[in-house]
Curated annotation (Swiss-Prot):
Record: residues binding S-adenosyl-L-methionine: Y1457
Classification via Pfam families: RRM_1 (PF00076), SET (PF00856), SET_assoc (PF11767)
Cysteines paired by S-S bonds: none
Gene name in the database record: SET1
Family, similarity comment: Belongs to the class V-like SAM-binding methyltransferase superfamily.
EC number: 2.1.1.354
Name of the protein: Histone-lysine N-methyltransferase, H3 lysine-4 specific
Basic residues: compositionally biased ranges: 1020-1031, 1163-1178
Annotated region described as Disordered, given as residue ranges: 1-478, 677-699, 805-838, 858-891, 977-998, 1013-1082, 1163-1182
Function field: Catalytic component of the COMPASS (Set1C) complex that specifically mono-, di- and trimethylates histone H3 to form H3K4me1/2/3. Binds RNAs which might negatively affect its histone methyltransferase activity. COMPASS recognizes ubiquitinated H2B on one face of the nucleosome which stimulates the methylation of H3 on the opposing face.
Annotated Basic and acidic residues bias: 64-74, 100-117, 127-138, 148-165, 172-222, 816-836, 1068-1082
Keyword Endoplasmic reticulum: no
Key words, A-Z: Chromatin regulator, Chromosome, Methyltransferase, Nucleus, S-adenosyl-L-methionine, Transferase
Enzyme class: transferase
């Protein structure tokens, strides 16, 4: 077949410029230079790109039709790529034409020679023609795609071509092509050519498969684009889409180098323009696939876009907003009418309808418009052009009526869509049968409008004429009147009936003619013309009837209170979450956490457990706080349910072996636990109080009047203060006398005050005063303790003042009122006044404040609940209670005193606040104290008294059972001591405390000293005289006497700090005076006056009255000096007297004359210590003036002397006020606090941090003022007993040595003495020891470790251990002696205080330093209570501790270390056991 018959351009020849270019892209036709490759190619609108030197040309091919004709009806000639643009450029930017034509992807190429043979030329054309075959041909014959080329290669045509190439020499061979040697004209006959051919064949096959995939992809895209334009399968729409697709012009891009003038004019018909190519050189037009090869128009290739598509198919009307863009004017005028104009009709918006029938309307009907309303014009701001819009309000501006939109040039990508829209606009609008226009198809479709001005295109046919729409004038309508709400007419059933409205039922019968009626009738609140009063019928019921019924039928007595759970809408604050924790109290000291956990584990899962311990000693407080996490696994409920169940079940149960019954309460937030710990610590470490009264003083019985006077109940006694001192009780006494109106409990001291806040002076005026810059003592400042009437107390820790001091109002009172309150009220007649006048609480003495604070039943936390004095005073005071114990309580208390007196041994007192004094608790107390074998358990309104048969049991009971619980009550044990019954001849003067008052009389003093003038002896007589005594507080000092007759106080002396133990009682020498000896007034109703006058103030005056047989003796008893005091208890015996005054008591002058007055006449010096080296005590007498009169038998020969008149002397307080030191009541208030604190023995806390310095001989003495500046020094163990509370038992003095070893050395070397006894003990093991050891394994003894008074910690017995019983085993690590020596040195370097090495024999040492039990804490004593033995058990040595004597609960276990004696004094260790038989040294 000729080349021209196959579509090959005849101009292409072997000498032509067309070069062979194999395919290089994914498509088969990409990169081909021959125009014939485009013939019959079904590739759609694909682009073939060819790179030129400076520009890129894109070609578009029509999708439909095998051949394309030009406007003349002929096929265009193929286009030469080299005609105007030059040789083509390969993908590597190298020219393909003149020199070489490369294959795609560098697979090889041939040189372009003009000297090819005809066979070579025809072969090249054949290959090119096969390469540009249509894609369908490639698909159909993909197997033998290049079969003809293979046959040509077999025939040797390629060899001929290669030989023809060889004539011109070697030029530009590609990669992998045949190479020839230089200078030769033939090709090498080797395997390289065959390999190159095979590789080319495989490349073509791969390219064909890629072309097939690309074709399927293009077909899929084409179908997708067709589906987008034809959503419905209607035949009309399908024909329209096929027409649009058939006449769509291909997309093309003209060359950038060609001008727009060269582009052909646009075609006016409906067919798309084709590319116009130039004719061939011979003038013949050759058909090409859309390309005209013309040298003139080669560079200017353009595309004509169709402007309109005039089809006869029916198209739905276009949207109104599209037509409005061309019909509405640009500058609309504002509307003039009130209502918006009616919208233009559809005739204006649409084209005249054509003769075609409209399509059937398948949309829902348009809703009708409201009455008297017209459709509004479309708004530009709205995206929906709905004709059924509501009327616009009057105030809003109306939208423009006519707007013109200039058209904007449309991009080529949207030309087809705009063409269809333009065609739709030009079509007439179909009409319905009735002549109305059909609504547009997108009436209910939301179409967004773009307010953009479209620039008109160059083509005039696309421009639509701009028309203005003139709206019709608005219709004149009359506005409707405003709407008024009509009155509400309720339904007939809700109409109000006449009458009050109270309806009830009566039993009236109304008979009608037929004799039928109703027994009940409803009446509108009226009966007989009167209003019926409605009453509750339950009020007429009896109590029995109201109590009948069950459940809801039972009559309710009151309204039920409804409760609701708290939520976010509740007005009350959110309550705390339900408690999930419990507080356990009353635990034994040996109860462990494991026991508590085991006890509570069955109730629920425990989340947290906190056992409270003593912060000072580390001992258990018996308080435990347990928090639950929830119920046990598998059980329903919450943690609160578990805690509630634990409280119900566990309260009152026993946990440990001690038998203590615990108390369990809910404590979700731990507040109760904190309060319980605080109270327990305060109970264990109470603030120090002044010591007890002297033991030689007796309690004076009350008279009948005093018994009738009521008193207030006492407070809880302090644990460290015994309630019963060594006192004797008179059998004839009904109750002890305290002072008028107050009953003193058994042995309670009256001078105690409650704890007070720290006293800190921050006032600048106080800082400027010299007497306030140091702690108060006997001689400091301008006001001394003796001048203010205070006794000297030993050093005490800082306590807190009562809160009443801080709550005093500062009210200024008249001067005379203040003087009367602060003075001794000289000259006041007390005859018509009350005998129990309230004293000011601010009094500087032991006034009503101290007595109230000690015996008030109110707590310190509830001061506002305490009764107050009705009169206002400038300083705090407390009012005495008007009630007291009943007569039965007093009688029972007297029986208790009698039982204690008969027992004669110390007893244990339990306050009623700790355990109620009820008879049902007696059996529980007997079980609680049965181990100590109490002789009797009695109780009164004050509490319980447990009596024992010896003097030591009470102390052991206090040490062991203190803070234990009985029936959920924590016991507070206090030991009371009693000296037992005494003869009545030895009875002393009654001792009273507090402040008493008399109805008349002034102050008088009687000072009894060692220096008194001789006086005649007073004989015993049967006559009696009445003595009235009145004792006032020294704080309200001042009298009619002169300055020289002011009572002589004790001499000033500095108070040394006290380092006594808080747990042990003070020695007899350390006990301070309980009361100061006060002034005493005695009026003896006798004729005449007599006085016992000594030197200066030593006066005993007796004033005679006017009665014929009455004498008055005034005795002014002053405070006795410290070394010269005479106990007033030796005045005489108090008995009941007979006479006119039943309340009087008779004081026999036998003791008065023999012991007191006789020594005044002799002038003998009294001993410095009254009893057993005891310091002289100060005593204050307090008795009712009218109720406690005494009769003294005196001799009538005594001549009394009239006393001298004394001038009024100002008191110290008056001097302070006059001097200006106290400016106002506030200064006096703070001074009162200072003096009250000093009275209690409190040390003030100064703001500058000053403190008292100890003596130079004290171990803690330092000169620099700071311990850090003193350096480190070692304090001997003996010296620690002087200031450590737990070391007060070490009383044995030892000589000072240079090097004193510690307990570590003692224990290290202490087991050497067992060398000799170890072997003997191991060989001579008795069966009793083995039996005791086996018994220990069965039941261990209850032991407890705590701070020891000897050294460090000690081991105490918690149960009775009889002699010979095994106590415990000394457990430790058994090592050789050499290893023990190494460990000893290691312990010394580590600073371990004790090594606890116990030598068993010469080779084995038991080391309990890190591996041991509590047995290693047993201390040494020269008087041991146990001993250590080494026994053999199954061939193994055991160290066992046995009791030598009976060990009682609370007693420390001690044994003798038996160290060998040391000759070197530096190695000797002092002994601190404090026993009576102490040797002084351990070795």
């Amino acid at each position: 077949m000729a080349p021209h018959e196959k579509g090959v351009n005849p101009s292409e020849s072997p000498s032509g410029s067309l070069k062979k270019a194999p395919p290089s892209g994914p498509k088969a036709l990409r990169g081909f230079a021959s125009p014939s490759a485009f013939r019959n190619a079904d590739i759609g609108n694909g682009l073939l790109q060819h790179r030129g030197e400076d520009e890129r040309i894109s070609f578009a091919f029509p999708r439909k039709g095998k051949e394309s004709l030009d406007r003349n009806g002929e096929r265009p000639a193929p286009m030469s790529l080299e005609s105007r643009l030059g040789p083509p450029v390969s993908r590597f930017n190298r020219p393909v034409g003149g020199d070489s034509l490369e294959r795609g992807n560098g697979k090889g190429g041939w040189d372009n020679r003009d000297e090819r043979t005809s066979a070579s030329s025809s072969s090249i054309h054949r290959i090119n023609k096969e390469k540009i075959r249509p894609r369908s041909d490639f698909i159909e014959s993909s197997a033998n795609l290049y079969s003809e080329d293979d046959r040509n290669r077999d025939r040797g045509r390629y060899h001929e071509r290669d030989r023809s190439r060889g004539t011109n020499g070697d030029r530009g061979g590609g990669e992998g092509h045949s190479h020839r040697e230089p200078g030769r004209g033939k090709e090498h006959q080797n395997g390289q050519g065959r390999d190159r051919s095979l590789y080319r064949d495989h490349s073509r096959e791969r390219e064909s498969s890629r072309d097939e995939r690309d074709r399927y992809s293009e077909e899929y895209k084409h179908q997708r684009s067709k589906a987008r334009f034809s959503p419905s399968p209607s035949p009309e729409r399908s024909r329209l889409k096929s027409s649009l697709g058939r006449h769509r012009s291909p997309v093309s891009v003209s060359s950038s180098s060609s001008s727009s003038a060269r582009s052909p004019p646009p075609v006016q018909n409906r067919e798309p323009l084709r590319y116009n190519g130039s004719q061939s050189k011979n003038g013949e037009k050759e058909l090409s696939n859309g390309l005209l090869e013309n040298s003139i128009s080669r560079s200017g290739v353009s595309i004509a876009v169709p402007r309109k598509l005039e089809t006869k198919q029916l198209v739905r009307p276009s949207p109104p907003h599209v037509n409005l863009k061309s019909t509405i004017q640009d500058n609309p005028s504002p509307p003039t009418g009130k209502y918006p104009p009616s919208p233009p009709s559809l005739d204006i918006l649409s084209k005249p309808s054509c003769n075609r029938e409209p399509l059937p309307d398948q949309r829902p009907p348009t809703p009708p418009l409201p009455e008297n309303s017209s459709p509004t014009s479309p708004s530009l701001e709205s995206s929906r052009f709905d004709q059924n819009q509501h009327l616009l309000p009057d105030e809003l501006p109306l939208p423009p009526l006519s707007i013109s939109f200039p058209q904007k040039p449309v991009s080529s990508s949207s030309l087809s869509r705009l063409s269809s829209l333009s065609a739709a606009l030009s079509r007439p609008n179909p009409l319905d049968k009735d002549g109305t226009s059909m609504p547009p198809s997108f009436h209910f479709r939301e179409i967004s409008t773009r307010h953009q001005r479209l620039s008109p295109p160059n083509n005039a046919e696309n421009q639509l004429p701009e028309t203005s729409i003139i709206p019709p004038p608005p219709s004149e309508t009359v506005p409707e009147p405003p709407w008024i709400r009509p009155p509400y007419i309720p339904p007939p059933c809700t109409k109000h009936r006449p009458g009050i409205g109270n309806f009830f039922i009566t039993n009236l019968r109304e008979k009608v003619e037929d004799k039928s009626g109703k027994e009940e009738k409803r009446v509108d609140g009226m009966e007989g013309g009167k209003v019926v009063q409605v009453t509750d019928p339950r009020l007429s019921m009896t109590e029995e009837q109201r109590g009948r019924g069950r459940g809801s039928s039972k009559q309710r007595a009151a309204f039920y209170e409804l409760t609701y759970e708290w939520d976010l809408y509740s007005v009350t604050p959110k309550p705390p979450s339900p408690p999930t924790a419990v507080l356990i109290t009353g635990l034994g000291p040996l109860t462990t956490v494991d026991q508590i956990t085991k006890f509570l584990r069955p109730h629920g899962r425990i989340k947290e457990i906190d056992s409270k311990v003593d912060r000072k000693t580390g001992m258990q407080l018996g308080i435990c706080w347990v928090k639950f996490e929830g119920p046990p696994l598998g059980r329903p409920g919450t943690a609160h349910d578990v805690a509630s169940m634990a409280v119900k079940v566990c309260d009152g149960k026993k946990i440990s072996m001690g038998g203590e019954r615990i108390r369990v309460v809910l404590d979700g937030r731990g507040k109760r636990a904190e309060q319980a710990v605080k109270e327990e610590m305060e109970r264990r470490y109470p603030p120090k109080k002044p010591s007890a009264l002297p033991s030689d003083m007796k309690v004076t019985p009350l008279s009948g009047t005093a018994m009738a006077t009521t008193s207030r109940p006492p407070n809880a006694p302090n644990a460290s203060t015994p309630l019963i001192d060594k006192q004797t009780f008179d059998t004839s006494a009904k109750a002890p006398i305290i002072r008028p109106g107050v009953l003193k409990p058994l042995g309670q001291k009256m001078y105690h005050r409650p704890s007070a806040p720290p006293l800190v002076f921050n006032n600048h005026r106080f800082r400027d005063e010299s007497f306030l810059n140091r702690p108060f003592n006997a001689g400091a400042g301008m006001i001394s303790q003796q001048q203010m009437g205070y006794k000297i107390l030993p050093g005490k820790p800082v306590q807190q003042l009562a809160s009443s001091f801080t709550s005093a109002p500062f009210v200024r009172h008249p001067r005379e009122r203040r003087e009367d309150s602060w003075t001794n009220e000289r000259g006041r007649r007390l005859k018509g006044e009350s005998s129990t006048r309230h004293w000011r609480a601010r009094s500087l003495s032991r006034s009503s404040y101290s007595s109230y604070s000690s015996y008030s039943s109110y707590s310190e936390e509830s001061e506002e609940e305490r009764p107050r004095h009705p009169t206002k005073v400038p300083y705090p005071q407390r009012k005495r209670l008007a009630t007291g114990p009943s007569k039965e309580d007093e009688y029972k208390m007297e029986d208790v005193r009698e039982a204690i007196r008969e027992n004669g041994h110390p007893c244990v007192f339990i306050d009623a606040k700790s355990l109620p004094a009820a008879r049902e608790y007696e059996s529980y107390l007997r079980d609680h104290f049965k181990a100590f074998r109490p002789t009797e358990i009695i109780h009164s309104h004050l509490g319980w008294y447990i009596l024992f048969a010896d003097d030591t049991t009470a102390y052991r009971v206090q040490r062991v059972l203190d803070t234990t619980a009985v029936q959920g009550h924590r016991l507070s044990l206090v030991v009371h001591t009693s000296s037992g019954p005494r003869a009545q001849t030895d009875a002393s003067e009654p001792v009273t405390g507090g402040v008493g008052e008399s109805k008349k009389g002034n102050w008088r003093y009687l000072t009894i000293t060692k220096k008194s003038r001789p006086m005649p002896a007073v004989k015993k007589s049967g006559k009696s005289a009445t003595i009235r005594r009145k004792v006032y507080s020294p704080s309200v000092s001042g009298s009619d006497d002169d300055d020289e007759q002011v009572p002589v106080m004790a001499q000033n002396r500095k108070r040394a700090p006290s380092y006594a133990s808080s747990t042990s009682p003070l020695s007899e020498d350390d006990r301070p005076f309980a009361r100061s000896v006060q002034r005493e007034e005695r009026d003896i109703d006798k004729e005449g006056k007599f006085s016992l006058i000594g030197k200066k103030e030593d006066v005993v005056s007796v004033k005679a009255a006017k009665g014929p047989k009455s004498k008055t003796i005034r005795v002014d008893s002053d405070e006795v000096e410290e070394n010269q005091g005479v106990p007033l208890a030796s005045i005489g015996e108090v008995t009941k007297a007979e006479g006119k005054q039943d309340d009087s008591t008779v004081v026999k002058l036998e003791t008065l004359l023999s012991e007191s007055i006789s020594e005044l006449t002799k002038g003998k010096k009294r001993p410095t210590k009254a009893k057993g080296g005891k310091a002289t005590k100060k005593v204050r007498l307090d008795q009712e003036a009218d109720d406690a009169a005494t009769k003294i038998q005196i001799d009538e020969d005594i001549v009394p002397q009239p006393p001298k008149k004394k001038k009024v002397v100002k008191t110290e307080v008056d001097k302070l006020l006059a001097s200006g030191v106290l400016m106002d009541e506030e200064d006096a208030y703070w001074l009162g606090r200072v003096l009250a604190a000093q009275e209690d023995g409190l040390e003030p806390i100064w703001s500058d941090g000053e403190e008292d310095l100890v003596d130079e001989g004290h171990p803690l003495f330092h000169k620099s003022g700071a311990w850090r500046a003193e350096g480190w020094k070692k304090v001997a163990q003996v010296q620690k007993s002087r200031y450590l509370p737990q070391r007060n038992r070490a009383v044995v003095n030892s000589e000072d040595v240079g090097g004193i070893t510690t307990g570590r050395t003692a224990r290290l070397a202490g087991r050497d003495q067992h060398r000799q006894t170890a072997a003997v003990a191991a060989n001579n093991t008795v069966e009793s020891d083995l039996f005791a050891f086996n018994q220990l394994r069965i039941r261990k003894k209850q032991l407890r470790f705590a701070r020891s008074a000897i050294e460090g910690y000690g081991l105490y017995a918690m149960e009775t251990i009889h002699a010979g019983e095994m106590v415990c085993e000394y457990v430790g690590d058994l090592v050789r002696a050499t290893v023990a020596d190494v460990r000893e040195q290691r312990y010394l370097k580590q600073g371990i205080g004790s090594s606890y090495l116990f030598r068993i024999d010469n080779d084995i040492v038991c080391d309990a330093t890190f591996k041991g039990s509590v047995s290693r804490l047993i201390n040494h004593s020269c008087d041991p209570s146990a001993n250590a033995k080494i026994i053999k058990v199954n061939g193994q040595s055991k160290i066992v501790i046995y009791a030598e004597r009976t060990l009682y609960p609370g007693e420390e276990i001690l044994y003798d270390y038996k160290f060998p004696l040391e000759s070197d004094p530096a190695l000797r260790v002092p002994c601190l056991c404090g026993a009576a038989t102490c040797r002084g040294w351990l070795n």
